[in-house]
Regions:
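Generic signal for short, ordered secondary-structure residues
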Residues: 62, 106, 148, 197, ...
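Substrate-binding groove of N-acetylhexosamine-processing glycoside hydrolases
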Residues: 2-27, 31-33, 72, 171, ...
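Active-site cleft segment of glycoside hydrolase catalytic domains centered on the general acid/base Glu
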Residues: 149-155, 185-221
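Feature activates predominantly on carbohydrate-active enzymes
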Residues: 1-184, 219
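Solvent-exposed loop/turn segments at secondary-structure junctions
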Residues: 97-100, 141-143, 185-188, 232-233, ...
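A generic "cationic amphipathic patch" detector
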Residues: 96, 104, 140, 147, ...
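Flexible domain-boundary/linker segments
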Residues: 100, 108, 144, 151, ...
Length: 601
């Protein structure tokens, strides 16, 4: 039996709440994430930007803690002023778990939650006073040791517990307009907190049941439930973001004025070269598109990685989908990287801010990219807007053709329930230069000369960008950093697509050494990690081809071999390898984010 934290509402009260939800069901929703200020003072080499670093927030009240909260509120005020001025009408923050009290939590943790509730109430007011509706993220499901023990003893289901938790939470925080539910990804290995989220929704039917149990609570309190379809590919639910039948199993026939579906624009993470997700056209439920303006795989705003023309194409296509009511702009969230520019606050975050401004003008107002860039240049007091537009066109070209390898990026590849990312050599803040990457690229790329010519042209474009920067009124140092970083990629491409010689190894090692000297580890500008090695990869090209043809497919639908072998037997094989031969699995793959093992669940 589900317990509630308040008495029943009157029929007239429920009717008025239902009316409120229905009235705003199709109202535009333009969300932006506001977690940046909470990373102040988070001094680690690689930052987990996936959520607020709760373990570093003040746990007591003293002068230092008060100064920290004052700084956060000052930053949030600056952020909210800018977001509201640009036209956003909602923000996302982390998270329900750290603000919802419950009797089953550890006593010392409840004391800390009481402190967080008091401080976040002040933070929420900053947004609501400026017309920005507050939405809080929530992973399903997050445990503490004591909570897990109590739920096990009481045989309490996750859905039942969450429904009770939200019922009380909504009463405590009437200023919170809704929740943003994530079921397909949980805390990574870099999260060190008493609360730990884990994946508990494994089947489409479980996701649907979760919605059926939580939506009535949201309707009762007139709050939105924004349900994210993003997953990392684990379990049967792992293809929710792109598989039409899984998507239909979860959402078909659902009718609730509280429900909004949130989908990333593509069938993978925030990469280029991805077609628009066709699930936008498969339901009339209100939905928003997720867009990232601090591109976690493309430098995080350390250099221009302009998204304007990319998002303009998606916006054009989305006009033909029913009930797309807005967008969720991730301007800070995402990635395990050393880069630390904070959007809408730091003056150095100009490239993130530019992407964010242009994205909203495209998605909300239907502007063309060039007009949006000119408006941003005028607002920020930059230089020649035409020079800036030219610079951004070159940047778009360089990112697409040198950060990515175009011929590989254009290929549609699936492994198990995941669409393979179109980027192979760069991952977050790491550049991989080694023989295994070389062999893979030479297998997938059939026109290496074109790739080499493209790299040379891009290096010329970077010099043109540096020359344009003073006229455009943007930081020359950012463009020089981009040239130095992409110069390593151009040299790596030469290594990848030509025969190996000792001379190319020497040039690469010298280039890496010079890069590290120019951008020291604890210097003012974070650098990429160059993971370099020239040990020959033992697998012959022919066997690589066999492995690719066996394990990967070039269409969305599953093959017979996928259903018989890849989705089931391969999981068992991986578990045996992880147990008996853990050294076969690269350390980076094991320790990054949730770890590669999640793909094999």
């Amino acid at each position: 039996m589900r317990t509630t934290l308040q008495g029943p509402r009157s029929r007239s009260s429920l009717a008025s709440y239902a009316g409120l939800l229905h009235s705003r069901r199709l109202q535009p929703l333009h969300l932006i994430d506001a977690i940046g200020p909470f990373f102040r003072g988070h001094d680690v080499r690689t930052i987990n930007w996936s959520k607020i670093p709760w373990q570093n927030l003040p746990k007591t009240r003293d002068a230092a803690a008060e100064a920290w909260w004052v700084q956060v509120r000052d930053d949030l005020t600056k952020f909210a002023d800018q977001a509201a001025a640009w036209g956003f009408n909602a923000v996302s923050l982390d998270d329900v778990t750290h603000l919802a009290d419950h009797a089953w939590l550890e006593p010392e943790l409840r004391e800390r939650i009481a402190l967080y509730r008091e401080e976040f109430t002040r933070c929420f007011a900053i947004f609501t006073e400026r017309g920005l509706a507050v939405h809080l993220t929530m992973d399903v499901m997050t445990y503490t040791p004591e909570l897990r023990r109590r739920m096990t003893e009481a045989k309490r289901s996750v859905n039942d517990y969450l429904a009770e938790l939200l019922d009380g939470f909504f009463v405590s925080f009437p200023q919170v307009a809704g929740i943003i539910v994530r079921i397909g990804e949980s805390d990574g290995k870099g999260v060190h907190d008493e609360f730990r989220s884990e994946l508990v929704i494994q089947k489409p039917a479980q996701a649907r049941r979760l919605l059926l149990d939580l939506l009535p609570v949201c309707e009762k309190h007139a709050r939105r439930l924004i349900f994210r379809t993003w997953t990392v590919g684990a379990y049967r639910i792992g293809d929710l973001m792109w598989h039409r039948r899984t998507f239909a199993s979860v959402f078909e026939g659902l009718q609730s004025p509280a429900l909004v579906i949130s989908m990333k624009y593509g069938e993978s993470d925030f990469f280029r070269y991805l077609p628009l997700n066709r699930n936008f056209f498969r339901t009339s439920i209100p939905k928003i598109v997720e867009l990232q303006t601090r591109r976690e795989y493309e430098g995080c705003g350390e250099y221009p990685s302009f998204t304007g023309w990319e998002y303009e194409r998606y916006a054009r296509e989305l006009k033909h989908a029913d009930n797309v009511i807005g967008c969720m702009v991730w301007c800070q969230t995402g990635g395990w990287v050393p880069f630390r520019r904070i959007a809408l606050i730091d003056s150095e975050a100009i490239w993130i801010d530019l992407n964010t401004f242009v994205t909203l003008r495209i998605m909300k107002d239907g502007w063309v990219v060039e007009d949006a860039v000119r408006a941003f240049a005028q607002e920020r007091g930059l230089g020649d807007a035409n020079a800036l537009i030219e610079l951004l066109r070159y940047s778009d070209e360089v990112v697409r053709e040198l950060l990515y390898v175009e011929e590989f990026a254009q290929q549609k590849l699936f492994f198990r329930r995941v669409r393979i990312p179109p980027m192979l050599q760069v991952y977050w803040g790491n550049i991989f230069i080694n023989h295994s990457v070389k062999k893979l690229l030479r297998y997938f790329v059939h026109e290496p000369e074109a790739a080499l010519h493209s790299a040379a042209r891009c290096m010329g474009r970077l010099e043109q960008m540096i020359a344009l920067a003073p006229r455009a009124g943007v930081p020359v140092a950012d463009l020089e950093y981009m040239r130095d970083t992409f110069g390593l990629l151009a040299l790596a491409r030469e290594y990848n697509f030509t025969e190996f010689t000792p001379e190319i190894e020497t040039r690469l090692r010298e280039a890496k050494r010079a890069y590290k000297v120019k951008y020291p580890k604890r210097g003012l500008r974070a650098r990429y990690r160059i993971k370099m090695g020239f040990q020959p990869f033992w697998l012959h090209r022919r066997y690589i081809g066999w492995a690719v043809e066996l394990l990967m497919r070039r269409r969305r639908g599953y093959r017979i071999i996928d259903r018989l072998l890849i989705l089931h037997v391969l999981s068992m094989i991986y578990r045996v390898i992880a147990l008996r031969k853990p050294h076969w699995i690269p350390g980076f793959a094991k320790e990054s984010a949730m770890g590669v093992d999640v793909v094999f669940r």
